[in-house]
A protein has these predicted regions:
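N-terminal intrinsically disordered, cationic/polar leader segments
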Residues: 2-123, 127-168
Length: 168
């Protein structure tokens, strides 16, 4: 397979948390993580499983969403959407929504948003990547192994887009 093209979609969320307690260190805890949705389509099987003359084009989009569950608790969703095509035909399509519940305490307001939208998805990513690799392998293809994703860059791009939109 050709190296996949990853298209990050910037995270969006409005997040709030209590003011930090003076003298206390910020704390980030994983309360749980879980698979919310998984879909794998192999629409042209068994023909798609035959040896191919050319490597498929693989496009992957990545999206992060978060929401408050309580004063210091957040759900963070990591959405991975992968599609492999050859000559305009879909070879396989996979859609994964993996999430975690996190407790963030004693984070200053200016660090809360980056912690939730950078650090939390960074913790979820290895598990989501493994599920996607297993799904493609179980679909009869080589495992789709994604390179690590720089969630900091995704976050910074979103901030730049928001600033550009605000100035326009």
């Amino acid at each position: 397979m050709k190296a996949p093209r990853v298209t990050p979609q910037a995270p969006t969320a409005t997040l709030t948390a209590p003011e930090p307690t003076p003298g206390q260190q910020p704390s980030l805890k994983i309360l749980g993580q879980y698979l919310k949705d998984l879909s794998f389509e192999n629409p042209n099987a068994p023909l798609s499983l035959a040896p191919q003359q050319q490597q498929p084009d693989i496009n992957i989009s990545v999206n992060v969403n978060a929401r408050n569950l309580g004063p210091s608790d957040f759900e963070v969703e990591l959405h991975l959407d992968a599609k492999a095509t050859t000559d305009g035909k879909v070879i396989f399509a996979a859609d994964l929504l993996y999430a975690g519940m996190f407790r963030l305490e004693n984070f200053p307001a200016n660090l809360l948003h980056p912690a939730v939208l950078i650090e939390c998805p960074r913790m979820l990513f290895p598990f989501a990547r493994q599920i996607l690799a297993d799904a493609t392998r179980n679909g009869g293809f080589p495992p789709l192994m994604l390179d690590p994703i720089d969630f900091t860059v995704m976050y910074q791009r979103r901030l730049q887009q928001q600033q550009a939109t605000a100035q326009a």
